[in-house]
Amino acid sequence: MLRGQEERKYSIRKYSIGVVSVLAATMFVVSSHEAQASEKTPTSNAAAQKETLNQPGEQGNAITSHQMQSGKQLDDMHKENGKSGTVTEGKDTLQSSKHQSTQNSKTIRTQNDNQVKQDSERQGSKQSHQNNATNNTERQNDQVQNTHHAERNGSQSTTSQSNDVDKSQPSIPAQKVLPNHDKAAPTSTTPPSNDKTAPKSTKAQDATTDKHPNQQDTHQPAHQIIDAKQDDTVRQSEQKPQVGDLSKHIDGQNSPEKPTDKNTDNKQLIKDALQAPKTRSTTNAAADAKKVRPLKANQVQPLNKYPVVFVHGFLGLVGDNAPALYPNYWGGNKFKVIEELRKQGYNVHQASVSAFGSNYDRAVELYYYIKGGRVDYGAAHAAKYGHERYGKTYKGIMPNWEPGKKVHLVGHSMGGQTIRLMEEFLRNGNKEEIAYHKAHGGEISPLFTGGHNNMVASITTLATPHNGSQAADKFGNTEAVRKIMFALNRFMGNKYSNIDLGLTQWGFKQLPNESYIDYIKRVSKSKIWTSDDNAAYDLTLDGSAKLNNMTSMNPNITYTTYTGVSSHTGPLGYENPDLGTFFLMDTTSRIIGHDAREEWRKNDGVVPVISSLHPSNQPFINVTNDEPATRRGIWQVKPIIQGWDHVDFIGVDFLDFKRKGAELANFYTGIINDLLRVEATESKGTQLKAS
């Protein structure tokens, strides 16, 4: 009987040892399969990895449960057979099984520790790509879930086949997993990166992924066993931007906009505006795109074919004729128009004409500023109004100015009227001067003889009172204001002053040997105090109407106007100046805004909108800012610029922080663009005629 019991105990021990061996072999096969899977395919997105991090814990717990049950069974057998001499063999086998199980467990932990460390490093570099791969992530999540189910089924089938596995097979050591270089394709809502160092294999890999959306990936991430501390480490690495973060290569598009009040930001905006593509095409801007580049040392030819001459308005002083504290007329300190355009390679000039003189005198001075020579106001004109016939001498910016050699003329405020009158004299002459010359003989200026067509390519006016301004009628041309203006000219005409306000032809300049008292007495007898030959009168409604009747449209010239408005309608229907309008124009804005005619009320502080659009007796057409303004023989009226007062066009309001230098840069480069299109249109027409 004792022998039968020992045989049964031996059979039980043998059976238990077999069960333990089978379980150990099963664990070895599973761990080997997991190690191989982790070597083949690292994780590709955050969502799939999160699911992977959760599932290995469940499988690890299942393995640990099997180990605990096996150990418990073996302990029970030890207690039951502790006194038997044959237990030694069972203990040896048990220790071998435990050692192998422990070794397999260490292998699993080693593999997963390495995997967690590598995944943590990889997560940071792939964070921005993961954010851009939402669609791919959802598809891959489905694939991961299907694969996990397949793996569980495979593990169960492996258990039934584990009896054929060699028990002496050594466990495979953990191997280093190479970093994953797969990149997720950016979605349509993410701007493309300008980084030239991005991997070139991205498109090929994305194409492979998108080619078979329903095909399961056989290289799924390995199961991992991590604790809470390791999981926190992974999440922290996901939140920190890494070197490969795309957001660092998009020039701050994801960052809030920086204020542009600082000079550095404003200068950068101006630089960007100046470096925008310039076009010379009439209909297809893209075909004739042209980038603005500064003139090189050996570059003589400017970007524009015809010189651009900017003509200032009433009270304007430019260049050496401007006092020390007088602001830069063209652009102020916001954007120095002449200087910046010259840096970009354009041939531009700022004319210096009378600040207080009439449009007639200013037009004559403008001609000699371009052509060069001593100013000749005309014998008939000098005799009629009672001032000197000759004025100062100009060097000239274009001594060979003649028909066929053209200029572009851009005038601000009264400057727009001045250039219109000069072009009229060039083309049709001055009838009074021609008649006086026939009657009295002598010399006559070429400006007054007429017949000088094709010398002006375009005329552009900025906030010009083509039809006059009520501010001049009710304020500027009043006797009190005129006396103040002429008194200022009288004072600045002293022998120690180098500032010329433009009334020297009226005697407003102290002679070298003349005392100041004698100078005052002489000037007080000048006819200017009662004359209409001055700016104050020419800016009135009546003075502007006379100019409109004197001038005509040239069918060969491109005409363009720009207009601003800086007033709003009050509760009583009148126009009041907007907040931010230049403070010196508050009174004039209210004078215009309370005009009896409603259509004359809206204004830019000095000029009514209706007056700036175009001369009332000449044809016009409304154009957009995008279409090429190249029509000739008709006024092309640009859209009204909301919020721009009279001096915003030239940027001299240093108290207006809303108007930036970049805004002026865009405005004037837009004008230059139109002038280049005019030249391109003319060249195209010449080629067609030649063919």
From Swiss-Prot:
GO terms for biological process: lipid catabolic process. This is Lipase 2. SUPFAM superfamilies: alpha/beta-Hydrolases (SSF53474). GO terms for molecular function: metal ion binding; triacylglycerol lipase activity. Residues 73-82, 226-238, 258-267 have a biased composition (Basic and acidic residues). It catalyses: a triacylglycerol + H2O = a diacylglycerol + a fatty acid + H(+). Residues 34-72, 83-115, 125-172, 186-207 have a biased composition (Polar residues). Residues 38-296 form a propeptide. Keywords: Calcium, Hydrolase, Lipid degradation, Lipid metabolism, Metal-binding, Secreted, Signal, Zymogen. It is an enzyme of class 3 (hydrolase). Ca(2+) binds at residues 580, 645, 648, 653, 656. Residues 34-267 are annotated as: Disordered. Residues 1-37 form the signal peptide. Belongs to the AB hydrolase superfamily. Lipase family. InterPro entries: AB_hydrolase_fold, Lip-like_C, YSIRK_signal_dom. The active site is at residues 413, 604, 646. Its EC number is 3.1.1.3. It is found in: Secreted. One of its GO terms (cellular component) is extracellular region. Disulfide bonds: none annotated.
